């Protein structure tokens, strides 16, 4: 969980680079070329148009020739020394079951956007591709990933068994299915995590079963808490913040419609695309951040420090941090920080949006030589506890030990943690189906029951399943990202003298950069999509 939240910030920071890369003219000869795939071909020009070829019912244009095949699977993280050991263990299974092998390829946190882009536009073999919600439009427009609809229909037995039908259909642009959603914590809400000892010292109660403080339900409540804690501990900083990691990153009372340039307010219950930065809700949030800043709740380097939120928490000098809340979020962060923590939901109920469901999906790259076998391997992983445990946790006795074998609860082997383990690195959320793998202590398998309850009761954005095609807006989105980078952190930490004046300056710059064109195009595409769903814009 900790790594997923770090990853979200990395994606946001890389958005501008990804927009530039995906719009750099790679949809020319490469896109028009036919890629030979065993006994069949796939035309990437039709992919760029967001259209799949017509096929006879019950058939698929991709046919598996059953020859030995090695699937290169990219993932995003820190390269670990025991990767080959994990591959060998997985391949003992895959060679027997599918006459296939898996070759894992790590893309580092700081370079994954650029490195994956280079692999897809070049000649590198990259069969299974981690596709981010922000990079998907460029990949589809440039034909860098395949349309998976036929492949899922034909070979996706486990995918259709484990993945919610709405989630299968969600990663699409104009009907082009570009990825498969991993079964992790798709449901999310934004909140705050705090030092439990200081919270209880201030007179608040924490639910031991959920690790949540139900007395704190708003920014106003949190402001009151921080005032009490600061009075007792003036030497401490109340709220963590960093460059590209201010609290505004986690204010999420809207459906961002991929990039946040034109959103649906009221948690996606409105279908009118509006400028977030002109809303009264955004203004009120920034005003609160200004009050926090003036009260000394942020550190003096809140918008310049490159020290991660996790590293700040581990110093013991900070009280709280904004974060994305998921089932088991508090216990995961307790493991990494070695502190007793408590959470609070201060921005409303759990919400399902295309952004949350499509945050990371698994696509198939255009250079894949055998899409059918690749999909078979991907589908097998979705249904194999053995392979998923190897991907998530490694090898028993080497990387993990059982705490409760009957319940499938594991922990690091003695003397190891996330920094010293040769493999176990907290990336279960990223791999295809974490739900069928073991559970890391102190969580229990009941975590997944809670997860499904949240999904069943969550507010679903009226645009869930909609992803807009931004291929005609690359220049505008690049300019908008540059403008946002100039203002976002100062607004997000309240580091402004006059909220109204800075917001006006920010909005003027956004409109000059082309925001209205983006909003209009999003609204047009959303209205067309809603018409196919039996809904109309409000």
Model feature map: region roles:
Residues 1-10:
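Bacterial Sec-dependent N-terminal signal peptides
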Residues 9-10, 15, 19-538:
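Extracytoplasmic/secretory soluble proteins
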